[in-house]
Amino acid sequence: LGIDKNQHVLEVAKSIPLITLNDSIKGEGIYSVQNDEEKGAYDAVSYLIGLGHERIAIINGNKNFTTYEYKLAGYKKALKENHLSIKQEYIVKVEPYERGGHEGVQKLLKTNYPPTAIFVASDQISIGVYKAIYECGYRIPEDVSVIGFGGISLANEMYPELTTVNQFPYKLGRVAAETMIQVLGKGNPKSKHKIIHCKLELGKSCSGISQKKT
């Protein structure tokens, strides 16, 4: 759900109970199940910083969705806490599809100082990121480290295997279904707003800055 749809959701919730996924709309009759996406993004960027990266970019979705706001906030928080400057040329917004990732990388690699690492808002976008990096003559992770977000099964099939923030989509859906069953059965869920924590899962798409060309 996008933040510009909140008012419509609030109106609908007056007559029937609703469950939102990865949105933070609060109101009577609204239940939510969401990931701590800001923390997931923060952990991903902090990991890259721990590897020695300072030129870290984010390829984010360009839709007006809270999911992208959370990820950008986590990205910025990690940089600030490690005393790294936030550079607007490293913040790229694209269509949240494979093509968007391809276009985002082309833009980043044209900057005066291309990033040595890229945090990508979704694994789907990461597919295009991989293709563009290779087409431009760069290697993963020797020249550019990449971290995705989502934990889709396709991440394991990418070469090299994508390091990603797993948001456990199946668990997210299961908890949402269980909550709705409780609500429809006139039960009282322990919490109206449930958090599913993300986990950074290491693949082979990241390496230390000392191993890269700078």
Language-model features, listed with the residues they occupy:
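Bacterial carbohydrate/catabolite-sensing allosteric modules
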Residues: 8, 13-214
